[in-house]
Design a protein with these regions (language model features):
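Small/polar-rich, solvent-exposed N-terminal microdomains that initiate assembly or binding
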Residues: 1-51, 73, 85-95
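Active-site-adjacent structural patch at catalytic or cofactor/ligand-binding sites
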Residues: 55-64
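Short, charged interaction patches at domain edges and termini
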Residues: 1-13, 42-54, 94-130
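Mid-chain, well-packed structural core segment of small domains
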Residues: 66-88
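Beta-hairpin (beta-strand-turn-beta-strand) motif
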Residues: 42, 64-66
């Protein structure tokens, strides 16, 4: 699996461990309550002569729930817990160094089914090692 996909899966595992109203998946929001993430425009912040690099992954987090408070609590918890961690997961050739908030969770709309939708974005800084 690629470094980017491994790092995203590791972040998803951290979110799932929070015990929110839903586990998180990749892709688009479905018809029911849920949380999803996907990588947005991203790239290396620094590249070294040995080709190790710092990647900045812009990770979009979207959520949907019939109860706005439940959704807001989940989205804010994701940001608070991920950005306040002191230890992040890593793999054989990569290590998450830091996670910061790019865009705070914000309400972006309501579906005809009365489900609220919120969106946010995280910067996931990953050090890759060849």
């Amino acid at each position: 699996m690629s470094v980017i996909n491994e790092a995203v899966e590791a972040v998803m595992d951290l979110i799932d461990a929070m015990g929110l109203f839903s586990t998180i998946s990749r892709g688009a929001l479905g018809t029911g309550n849920g949380l999803v993430c996907e990588v947005g425009p991203s790239g290396p912040e620094s590249v070294y002569l040995d080709k190790n690099q710092y990647l900045i992954l812009d990770l979009t987090i979207n959520g949907k729930h019939n109860n706005l408070f439940t959704l807001s609590e989940a989205m804010n918890t994701i940001h608070e817990e991920l950005t306040m961690r002191k230890v992040y997961p890593g793999g054989e050739s990569w290590q998450i160094v830091d996670i910061t908030t790019l865009t705070e969770p914000q309400k972006i709309g309501r579906e005809d089914s009365n489900a609220w939708i919120m969106a946010s974005a995280l910067n996931v800084k990953v050090y890759t090692m060849l």
